[in-house]
């Protein structure tokens, strides 16, 4: 949502993808329209390659693609199910690749692809193995795509740190994690979205991951 609103404020019309959160999508649509921008809702299951290609085939042109959909299953290595492993890799890694592959042909005047990774890609989170692996691989994919699609299309990643407390993280664990951050607080939403603004405005940056984590990856 925040990335879509940022793009709308920068003057872009928006294609807003959602899977099952139709109420939230409609609310975001209204917020974007209040900024006098056009917005088109696109429902799709991004773990299904057929639905990805159907979604992209309806686009005439594209300037910026933000890959932010993610699945973060909790579970140690000995407890993680094959289903959760596959879903995490399909949504967090395969979908961004297929979207980049399909959308590149729509960026006829050049464009920007931004993959949303995670500070977890810099760490070894044993309680989120499939998520951590997928995000680390997505950063590698970002570099590969940047070389493959240059000079017409730039490809970068943003790796946020902690922003909002997840329902699966107990309050005491959240406080412990925040206490480890050198800047001693979670990120504000606008501190993450400003990285997207930077990548749009600076057209000499490609193949890079912008880490916005308050220094957490240092500890």
Feature roles, as predicted:
Residues 76-77, 81-89, 169, 177:
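Substrate-binding pocket helix/loop in short-chain dehydrogenase/reductase
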Residues 100, 134, 142:
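Active-site helix of classical SDR
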Residues 1-15:
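Canonical Rossmann dinucleotide-binding motif of NAD(H)/NADP(H)-dependent dehydrogenases/reductases
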Residues 106, 188-212, 217:
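C-terminal substrate-recognition "lid" of short-chain dehydrogenase/reductases
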Residues 68-73, 214-215:
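Conserved NAD(P)H cofactor-binding loop of Rossmann-fold oxidoreductase domains
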């Amino acid at each position: 949502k925040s990335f879509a609103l940022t793009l709308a404020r920068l003057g872009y019309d928006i294609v807003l993808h959602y899977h099952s959160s139709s109420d939230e999508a409609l609310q975001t649509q209204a917020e974007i329209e209040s900024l006098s921008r056009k917005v088109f809702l696109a429902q799709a299951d991004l773990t299904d390659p057929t639905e990805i290609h159907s979604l992209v085939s309806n686009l005439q042109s594209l300037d910026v693609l933000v890959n932010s959909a993610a699945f973060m299953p909790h579970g140690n290595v000995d407890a993680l199910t094959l289903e959760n492993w596959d879903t995490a890799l399909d949504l967090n890694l395969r979908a961004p690749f297929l979207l980049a592959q399909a959308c590149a042909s729509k960026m006829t005047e050049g464009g920007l692809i931004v993959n949303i990774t995670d500070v977890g890609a810099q760490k070894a989170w044993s309680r989120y193995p499939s998520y951590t692996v997928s995000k680390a691989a997505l950063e590698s994919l970002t570099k590969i795509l940047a070389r493959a699609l240059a000079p017409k299309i730039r490809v970068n990643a943003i790796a946020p740190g902690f922003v909002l407390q997840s329902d699966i993280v107990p309050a005491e664990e959240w406080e412990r994690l925040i206490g480890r951050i050198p800047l001693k607080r979670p990120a504000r939403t606008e501190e993450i979205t400003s990285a997207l603004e930077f990548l749009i405005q600076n057209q000499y940056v490609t193949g890079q991951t912008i880490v916005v984590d308050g220094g957490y990856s240092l500890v």
